[in-house]
Curated annotation (Swiss-Prot):
Clinical note on disease: Defects in Lmx1a are the cause of the spontaneous neurologic mutant mouse, called 'dreher' (dr) and results from a failure of the roof plate to develop.
Disulfides per UniProt: none
Gene symbol of the encoding locus: Lmx1a
Protein name: LIM homeobox transcription factor 1-alpha
Cited SMART domains: HOX, LIM
Regions of compositional bias (Low complexity) in chain numbering: 256-269
Gene Ontology BP, a term: regulation of cell growth
One Pfam family matching this protein: Homeodomain
Localization in the cell: Nucleus
Amino acid sequence: MLDGLKMEENFQSAIETSASFSSLLGRAVSPKSVCEGCQRVISDRFLLRLNDSFWHEQCVQCASCKEPLETTCFYRDKKLYCKYHYEKLFAVKCGGCFEAIAPNEFVMRAQKSVYHLSCFCCCVCERQLQKGDEFVLKEGQLLCKGDYEKERELLSLVSPAASDSGKSDDEESLCKSAHGAGKGASEDGKDHKRPKRPRTILTTQQRRAFKASFEVSSKPCRKVRETLAAETGLSVRVVQVWFQNQRAKMKKLARRQQQQQQDQQNTQRLTSAQTNGSGNAGMEGIMNPYTTLPTPQQLLAIEQSVYNSDPFRQGLTPPQMPGDHMHPYGAEPLFHDLDSDDTSLSNLGDCFLATSEAGPLQSRVGNPIDHLYSMQNSYFTS
């Protein structure tokens, strides 16, 4: 019985000792702890804690080189890195050599770009720019004031249609700065001091190397240009001018293609508008013959303005005829009396047209008052 009690006491003391030892080394693993690296439940007795997250011991390694991290580490985007790869991936890079800049290095700034002191130099003459020097940052490349002015002068002399002429590929790949300078000196006879630069003709191998590099990047860095110059045996300036001319050529082709697309769209719009206009013109041509005739009211108004239908209002004495004392100014009794005479007015019906048959042209045949006067004169003279 005493032996059993002693064994139980020893077991409890061993448990307390192990608990105190685990509290010194690390935290006991709870069944709900999940590793931040592999997203699995941690079943180990001990774990590592980084930035309020739990990790397996074997998961604490660099995400780039897979080396285990023992003393220090860098944490970014839920990943761990060693010092070397963290500085290589996320440190500020030089705008010239694209290498990482150490925190203890001196730098030169140009707008948003940062450069090493040795990399802060002109890309043409490779002269290191000092504090206070004037320079130009063009397409991510540094140019001193003198080289920038020379480049502007050379580019202004380049003919814009030189790349689109019907020449061979070798002639199109000439160094256009030299060609433009020679052309400008020949056209301007007054400027005899400007020397003609030699024309550089590229071989097929050189042109292929340039085009392959242009497909990778249209704006290569200084190291790539120096490598191409060493491979092709040309100067860095020739390589730089070729890339500038090639970029200008691609932009011009893109603008020309866009202009052609706009012209096609405008042509289609004009064609559709002309088609619709011809359809409307056909309908107007069909309706025009019927719309040109004047209306009956217009015909009557014209005839009434020519002939005066009421002569008795002008102060004339009305003619005296048998039976006119009943209707001195009326026309209907006069017509009835005249129609009763078959000898002298037998052709009176031939002089008038029926209103229903003549229509608006009745007023053009003659005024009934005029016919009445003519028949009256013939009646009294007979």
